[in-house]
Amino acid sequence: MAHQAHAYHMVDPSPWPLTGAIGALFLTSGLAIWFHFQSVTLLTLGLILLLLTMYQWWRDIIREGTFQGHHTPPVQKGLRYGMILFITSEVFFFLGFFWAFYHSSLAPTPELGGCWPPTGITPLDPFEVPLLNTAVLLASGVTVTWAHHSLMEGARKQAIQALALTIILGVYFTALQAMEYYEAPFTIADGVYGSTFFVATGFHGLHVIIGSSFLAVCLLRQIQYHFTSEHHFGFEAAAWYWHFVDVVWLFLYVSIYWWGS
């Protein structure tokens, strides 16, 4: 490796952004094909390609940051700014869904019966599964903070336990959400109520799955002694992301489940 007289990481050429983009294209196109033609071939191909890309890209970043020492303090600072900007872009992404929901619900058109929820829609009880989901997600926010503090204090076993607990709570939330979708008395095709409900809560559910995988990678890395109390940006980024998912759910619960019902 050539000697460099600066603290910045000159990233080597990598195929993963391209394979990741192709995987995402196949996944979204496959989803549309599955909805309309009941064929899961392209969807499965996209999912496999995306999972392989994730595995190999994560592997490369772990090699560069943990074993080759490329993640110097200035590089970590850049990664922090990058994560903050990414979460900010996600805030605006969800803002669009809330805008659609409030636009439709605050001034319901005569076609909807002039009321909200629209005529013929039976909304879900906000004090049943949605309230349990809120408790589960808030508890996972506590456990991820416990994991972070344990990591900073060098309490390795506690960090592993807290991380494992957070992932279990994330999986439990996803299972409850899937059950709620299965038993919902309305579908995504039931006008503006169905579409805003399922798109907003569905994208949030997708973010919970992404966050759970992010934390699962952190758990594996913590088990393999990759993190130290000073050097654990991968975990920090996962924790920020998880707290963001937490806060979005609180807004979804108050807006769509409680006020919207």
From Swiss-Prot:
The chain crosses the membrane at residues 16-34, 41-66, 73-105, 129-152, 156-183, 191-223, 233-256. Its main location: mitochondrion. Residues 1-15, 67-72, 153-155, 224-232 are mitochondrial matrix. GO terms for molecular function: cytochrome-c oxidase activity. Coiled coil: none annotated. Keywords: Membrane, Mitochondrion, Mitochondrion inner membrane, Translocase, Transmembrane, Transmembrane helix. Its EC number is 7.1.1.9. Residues 35-40, 106-128, 184-190, 257-261 are mitochondrial intermembrane. One of its GO terms (cellular component) is respiratory chain complex IV. Pfam families: COX3 (PF00510). It is a multi-pass membrane protein. It catalyses: 4 Fe(II)-[cytochrome c] + O2 + 8 H(+)(in) = 4 Fe(III)-[cytochrome c] + 2 H2O + 4 H(+)(out). It is found in: Mitochondrion inner membrane. InterPro entries: Cyt_c/ubiquinol_Oxase_su3 (IPR024791), Cyt_c_oxase_su3_dom (IPR033945), Cyt_c_oxidase-like_su3 (IPR000298), Cyt_c_oxidase_su3-like_sf (IPR035973), Cyt_c_oxidase_su3_a-hlx (IPR013833). CDD domains: Cyt_c_Oxidase_III. One of its GO terms (biological process) is mitochondrial electron transport, cytochrome c to oxygen. Component of the cytochrome c oxidase, the last enzyme in the mitochondrial electron transport chain which drives oxidative phosphorylation. The respiratory chain contains 3 multisubunit complexes succinate dehydrogenase (complex II, CII), ubiquinol-cytochrome c oxidoreductase (cytochrome b-c1 complex, complex III, CIII) and cytochrome c oxidase (complex IV, CIV), that cooperate to transfer electrons derived from NADH and succinate to molecular oxygen, creating an electrochemical gradient over the inner membrane that drives transmembrane transport and the ATP synthase. Belongs to the cytochrome c oxidase subunit 3 family. This is Cytochrome c oxidase subunit 3. It comes from Formosania lacustris (Oriental stream loach). The lineage of its organism: Eukaryota, Metazoa, Chordata, Craniata, Vertebrata.
